[in-house]
């Protein structure tokens, strides 16, 4: 009967607490805070594990589609191999891409398994064990606390009543004391358990989240390793395509020689080509120390330095880029300052630098030397070493580099552009510092570090900006009657009326750069000949002494350049 009555009292007390008719005064604030933290952790971990499982399910559908794509590549490769034996290259690249795609989907499958086995399942186990045990312990604590509180209320009521026998009050007091002892013991145990559970859950969660990152690290690392192994094959395939294209162009030239207008057009193009042209040949033809296209492009970009964001990072309209590239290469009239989107001009400059012949701007032979400077810990010694390496560049290469880095340093100094030295190095570096052999992924970051250092230390390396010596109109107008050679060689004698009505701008054309360290003795063959006594011979071989020439790089239909695939929303401010 006593037990039944005690249960009635406890149930009544429990109902009163839940209906807010009686405040919970026995439970300490620490216990309430520990319970709240445990409950929140459990809820968030449940949401997290469900999201991981949902992501792996959707990724599984993508894996099925990717596997089907890989099978199609391989089937096409087998068909070409069996039925078109002359298309060995096509069959080979189809096979390699199919194998890569299949391996990539297998990597994605392993990633999903890792996310489930190493992340989701262990977190679910924490919910079902530690957190569940803590919840049950707190439930037992609440049961003991409510029983103790109910008997305290009952004892208080007995003491208020009259004609209650002392033995009954004494019995109630003894019961309350027993419940108090039990309540304190259970309270200590529950508090310790909740503390331990929260700590263990934190450690376990951090560990599993590290496993989450490790899974993705393994995924991307293996993917990059596969791509790095395929890069030499990609170069071989591209060289094959370029060779076949060249053979096709030769056959077209032989046919076009039979038709006078087409022959004249081909001859005209060879006299006006800018992109992919040997720099010494181009400068000799134009009679200048800096390509006229670069002069106009740099001036147009300078007009936007203080107002435009993302110069050299954001992409222009690819159709417009291609149209202006054609105009410049074909010697047609153009005006870069009239282009509304300055990013088109920036993309044209990157495209020109990427296709520079016969070598990239920082040359193949100096690539390893520049990369090795990253191992120099002392900043001053590193800058001095880079300066010494750059001073050994051919004179016409050094002049172009001087003007380019001057422009980049001006952009980096403008907060509005949001293009610090590191940002600029990321998008410009791969176009001027290129390895002649296999690409080493680790060297890309080191190369960007070198270019960042050059931009940051422009004044120290180059001794200041180039001198202002000549001016050039905004608009390029082709000379009349196809007498380009004579007109270009006598460019300084052309009257202003020969150009479209636009303001002439002052440009940087330093024929003898102000860095005294340039080695003229090693570059005598690269000096620009402006004499009318020695006209430019388009059939003469490129005048260059140094490392072997690199293969021509043709523009793609998309006219994209390295670094142009960024969307504006993807832009991040890199640390300088």
Curated annotation (Swiss-Prot):
Coiled-coil segments: 123-189
One BP annotation, GO: small GTPase-mediated signal transduction
SMART domains per the UniProt record, alphabetical: RhoGAP
Residue spans of biased composition, Low complexity class: 482-500, 514-530
Region (Disordered): 472-576
Keywords: Coiled coil, Cytoplasm, GTPase activation
Biased composition (Acidic residues): 565-576
Coiled coil is among the record's keywords: yes
Cystine crosslinks: none
Location(s), subcellular: Cytoplasm
Signal sequence, start to end: none
Biological role stated in the UniProt entry: Rho GTPase-activating protein involved in the signal transduction pathway.
Protein name as annotated: Rho GTPase-activating protein gacP
Organism: Dictyostelium discoideum
